[in-house]
């Protein structure tokens, strides 16, 4: 490699080899710009229109930028290598490579200084912040409207005072010409910036910050202080933000290209530079001519505008357009956006050696192969073929080889075969949503023009054969081939990186074939026969003595775990024996694994087990065999379906009629005024969705029923049922629409239409039904188009925030971790503890609760067997290591991450876990968004309003508060009542949080059976209950001010609703409430001390009247909740984005920050004042102002725990972090995000979400700066924070304190330590401006920055290279230190001796 470099450098002396570890960005000083430049550009001309040679001193000048042809000067006096380095005396052009025209820069000397628009206009304006002036004032000075006073002298003027033209002249008259200095334009700003004494300002700002009490002022000062410090420490000078010299980029980067027809296409930059040069020259001339001030000023203003447009066109004033009214692309536009330098050329490069074609299925391929059309292969492997032809002596020149290949001679095909053997190619299908979208295969040459793809990898590529295209890429270098073979081969990608499940899973026909193969039917010919071996069985099959599905007995030879040969007599079917033949022989895989009906899920499970017990190679062979078997049997079975396979259940109309009656009842209740319109709507919709479910159940019963033939044998299973049940195609939901009832439809707005579609597709829809059903379908299609883009953007943000998350060490040694429990939702286990801890590292010893012996040691990875043991022992909670608590500075350690899901082994050093996490979360986003329309908007509602026990056990109630109301029901009176079901040995099996106002059917100590009802409630309303017995009284419930009797138009019945009393006349001070009075007419007291007064919120519907007698638990009023909306990932994607962006939800919940007692204070304008008196006397009371329309379901005197909700709603993640800490926040985010994906049946491992959340928690907000340089209130990187604090402690100073802050993914990406990464993500201008002002150094640690500067990424194989380089640098350092020591010792010992000769430095 080094040799090559040297040879290259012989021919290319201009570029020194660049070795660097970091890149720094800062503001260029005028001296720096001149040092880059090879000459000044004085003329706006580009090239001579006759000779087409560049004009001298023009924008393409050869004297400045270098020759146009290699080693040839412009006039042609010197040609060839031998004159290298000579400067021609005639045309002054250096004889060298023309490539220097890509590197050499020029400059323009400006006649008047101009402000750099980025530092002026990019908000916040850096110049403005430094000078403490507003942007408006700055612009007035810069664009020559106002003078600014620099030196007031002895006059009454103040420094930095703005004076208009008249004021300036008046002041000169008043105080005399030279009594004060005022200037105008960029010169004035430059003088101001030059005169800044940063140290003084720094001290002054710190003093002011210490004195101020106002938060806003403090923030403002902190911002200014930050920028002052940036200039102090970065070595940038403030006056450099004003330009006196403009650099000109090399001409080959802004080329002039001749088009046919004698015209030229030019880069927009040339136009922009030309304007600057023209205006600059004109200004020079006017100044020489001593033109009037007003003209010069105008010219200076125009020069400022020209330079602005060059740097950032359109940032200020109107956009400068070219000849065709198109805005010109300025330097800033070259960088930003998808088409900018960063994203188009540095992060996304195009490659040579690639082709694309349509894909077709290749069922006879092995898993590691793909079919490559010969024509395509010939083109792709051309260079290899040429070199082989040459090596074999079949051609002597490339030209000859070319001819041979073009003629497609037979020897060429032989050589192509040789070349292709063992040379993997990469296949890619766009969109590449996760890493399985690019995989390596060994090419097999085929005729035809389409690429053949193995059927089992389709699900990884998300490919189908309806016209999809795929691209082929050839890895050229040996390293690339090696990586393709070892890391990317399709045989290595058996498990899905998102969840560790197999992704090489049979689908469609294969599943159907295997399902058919494994069916067992009663009463078929030959039932009960016994077979000794396969030959007998096949003989019987082929001679039709038995059927594939006949129940038979078979002698199965098997090796058990001790390694002994055993024989079992199995009851099975012929089909299953055939399936058993392809199962790998392993003691861990008994025949029972496949001695059952094979659905897609079962097959996936078998593949998983084969992978775990027999390893990768066996799995691949097994998959190939199982595929062949499935295809063959699907073909033999000849399954098809007809109209009669869709069975409409007989009981359908009975169910429909009864539901219609029910709906009529609700209609009547509404007309009688017993229920509101919203409640009626909810109930009707509920009834219909129940009916639909019931019909679907009936239909499934009939379709799946086993029918007997006259001879007593079981008939074939229904084909449609087979397809759906096996998981080959279709789902019960689709079958329901075909043969049951289509059910409820959603409007485009997401609301559900009350009238359902009663027909199914077999019966056909009526016109009205058809119209209603088009809504859903159309919405589905429109959504798809929109959501694909959203999902792609989410993935991009995720990748950006997590890209530098890499496994950098084996173990960080932390003792921290997070606790994992099973997730139980409404009594059903949604995610078991086992599934959540599998493949994670134990954070502490896991002990058996009964015997207290250790099941898993601390620091061990939990494998399948450990998880099983934990489950058997009935452990409820396990502490595991997590990415969130990993203490490494850079990256994550292997122990905290756990198992590499795609390999099933502990994670390797250098694995890019951040990118994998981002892909795993982003990929299903797109998948799901593309999938909404499959069910045609059929509305699915999940409202849960009963709790049934899932276990037998004993009831234990925590925070019990139950009252018996007037109707004799037991009612839950508190919000934090929890009913648990425990085993006889005391283990909790399930816990249920009981809704306030729910009817409870059990009590403490009761024994319940599985399926018994524990509690129920009305899901559509929230009640307000009374806790004491007495008589109703109203307070501030005044007709037409705070309460209105509304007549329901359709029913004519009045009901009383609390209206917004603040908006009525004279209602501002009202506090509407219901009170309970005793016999003496006084308001009763509650047990905990407050009055029995129940505040009402807007829209509450009263259920009682004045003077009525109530018992505890009776309903005083009820608040109607939102009508049921359908939940579909539409709600999902924005929800996921909202969580990752850490946005505050619209109606955020208000959370109690401390434990204490609730007290209501005086109301404030239109807010209720509520405070919490702490239980712990050391804490301060907290006060909250709550908008009056919000329903506070707490009463005066209630006790709340820290973290309880005062006002219901979605909690803001920032509040959870501040009040409950990182672990709770992580649990909340993980659960919320998982819930969205779970609804869609998508499995994502928790650790991926944890990795992203870790990246969102990288910043710390300083609460107390201690004796450090940090500023309180600013956000600092964790790494920086710890480093600065360590330094402070070392020096004996007081360290700073801070709290972790949660940043959304966009914000976190923009605040990463690498400015390259941030600039290439979004808001390029802002990021670069800020980085330059701060003189930021990019340590090149993440993946993105390394790709940008063209290095190996520090992950995967690049990680080991980085490690080697690190070791080498350390060694070199040691050697050099040793040399320096020796050099120091020798002269001291022998002053007259000659210096010691050392080996040359490396």
From Swiss-Prot:
It is an enzyme of class 2 (transferase). Zn(2+) 1 binds at residues 73, 75, 88, 91. InterPro entries: DNA-dir_RpoC_beta_prime, DNA-dir_RpoC_beta_prime_bact, RNA_pol_asu, RNA_pol_N, RNA_pol_Rpb1_1, RNA_pol_Rpb1_3, RNA_pol_Rpb1_3_sf, RNA_pol_Rpb1_4. Its cofactor is Mg(2+); Zn(2+). Gene3D superfamilies: 1.10.132.30, 1.10.150.390, 1.10.1790.20, 1.10.40.90, 2.40.40.20, 2.40.50.100, RNA polymerase II, clamp domain (4.10.860.120), RNA polymerase Rpb1, domain 3 (1.10.274.100). GO terms for molecular function: DNA binding; DNA-directed RNA polymerase activity; magnesium ion binding; zinc ion binding. Pfam families: RNA_pol_Rpb1_1, RNA_pol_Rpb1_2, RNA_pol_Rpb1_3, RNA_pol_Rpb1_4, RNA_pol_Rpb1_5. Its EC number is 2.7.7.6. The keyword Nucleotidyltransferase applies. Binds 1 Mg(2+) ion per subunit. Binds 2 Zn(2+) ions per subunit. Keywords: DNA-directed RNA polymerase, Magnesium, Metal-binding, Nucleotidyltransferase, Transcription, Transferase, Zinc. The keyword Iron-sulfur does not apply. GO terms for cellular component: DNA-directed RNA polymerase complex. Mg(2+) binds at residues 464, 466, 468. Zn(2+) 2 binds at residues 812, 886, 893, 896. GO terms for biological process: DNA-templated transcription. It catalyses: RNA(n) + a ribonucleoside 5'-triphosphate = RNA(n+1) + diphosphate. The RNAP catalytic core consists of 2 alpha, 1 beta, 1 beta' and 1 omega subunit. When a sigma factor is associated with the core the holoenzyme is formed, which can initiate transcription. Belongs to the RNA polymerase beta' chain family. DNA-dependent RNA polymerase catalyzes the transcription of DNA into RNA using the four ribonucleoside triphosphates as substrates. This is DNA-directed RNA polymerase subunit beta'. It comes from Rhodopseudomonas palustris (strain ATCC BAA-98 / CGA009). The lineage of its organism: Bacteria, Pseudomonadati, Pseudomonadota, Alphaproteobacteria, Hyphomicrobiales. The gene is rpoC.
